[in-house]
Regions:
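C-terminal motif of bacterial Sec signal peptides marking the signal peptidase cleavage site
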Residues: 5-8
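Compositionally biased intrinsically disordered regions enriched in Thr/Gly
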Residues: 10-252
Length: 252
């Protein structure tokens, strides 16, 4: 998915960003197995790679580092308020070592974990990054998810759903997104819609802003078959102007 966010100079308390994408971990190991006619290969390749975006702005880099650390380390990592880059490297190393150990114990086709970091753009006080996480631990294909970080540079925090739409207004947002989804599926004549009920439908916590509205991103399998990848549902500005926090309304 390609996202273009326009940079604007007014009301910014950070300069136009010069973002560097750094590879902080990249290890590949081959685990060899005794030859067997039952298998098509006699080895498994283990790949773990991690990227981190850096801006040169201390508070922003720490926020991005902590978020990446949480993505890689899981719930336990949330207890660490100020992880270092070395802490993140150790988490990648742990994933790599666990993959290798698992491959030695059980014959596998391979395993991989890739964390990619992308700078999407800046508009006034909103700075947007994304992380793509690709994992493969066996089977016909791996899994890819895209996670967004919309950072308010005034508040120095990553925005959550409750920041942009109050909880008591989210049922209206859900209705808007559900209508977009059903129209999308009907136009595509996609019978996958029968597998998702309105009661089971939720507002994705992954979103990004653009000139059309707020785009909510759902991972493969959540709303459509795997082959379609991420599904993006758009809440257009005119549909949500009465429920969105005015601070984050691009069309006010």
């Amino acid at each position: 998915m390609t996202t273009v966010l326009l940079a604007a100079c007014q009301e910014q308390d950070v300069p136009t960003l010069q973002v560097k994408k750094n590879v902080i971990f990249d290890q590949v190991k081959t685990v060899n197995y005794p030859h067997s006619d039952e298998y098509t290969t006699d080895n498994a390749q283990i790949e773990v790679r991690g990227e981190l975006s850096e801006t040169g702005i201390k508070w922003l880099d720490q926020l991005l580092l902590k978020h990446a650390y949480t993505l890689v380390g899981g719930e336990d990592s949330m207890k660490k308020d100020t992880p270092t880059k070395q802490d993140l490297v150790q988490k990648f190393q742990q994933i790599h070592d666990e993959f290798v150990q698992s491959a030695k114990e059980d014959r596998v086709l391979g395993a991989s974990f890739h964390l990619t970091s992308n700078y999407l753009g800046q508009r006034n006080n909103i700075i947007t990054f994304s992380n793509d996480i690709d994992t493969y631990t066996g089977g016909a294909h791996g899994i890819n998810v895209t996670l967004f970080q919309n950072i308010d540079s005034h508040k120095k925090k990553i925005l959550e759903l409750n920041d942009i739409v109050k909880q008591d207004q989210q049922s209206k947002l859900k209705e808007v997104l559900w209508n977009f989804y059903t129209n999308l599926m009907e136009e595509a004549n996609d019978d996958y819609i029968g597998m998702i009920t309105k009661e089971d439908f939720n507002i994705s916590e992954q979103f990004y802003f653009n000139n059309e509205g707020i785009n909510f991103v759902y991972p493969p399998y959540a709303l459509r078959a795997y082959a379609y990848g991420n599904v993006v549902l758009t809440a257009y500005w005119h549909e949500i102007e009465d429920i969105i926090n005015p601070e984050y309304n691009w069309k006010k």
